[in-house]
């Protein structure tokens, strides 16, 4: 009867500028312990899954085997229960800088800007009717 909730640990994208850019989480014992505590808390809160973003691969692998909800990785190694990627990053709509794990498969952002530029050039060539 509740709302399904997916938890999120590791990098929180909305904090990238505040923390000085993209970086891996879980490199220190203190950070690893904090991630473990957060994952357990999310499990206990009833999350149906937990996103592990930009985490140390070994820590993510350990967490995947220690919590019941699936651990869905995004830049956290191949030992997670599943993988996701932000579509805008994958297709090249996100401006730089990108996280180190993102390898865009297209450059739709650049293609879109080029298309808009062509449109503007064409529009400026249309004669203006004087009233």
Regions found by a protein language model. Name each.
Residues 1-131:
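Alpha/beta enzyme core
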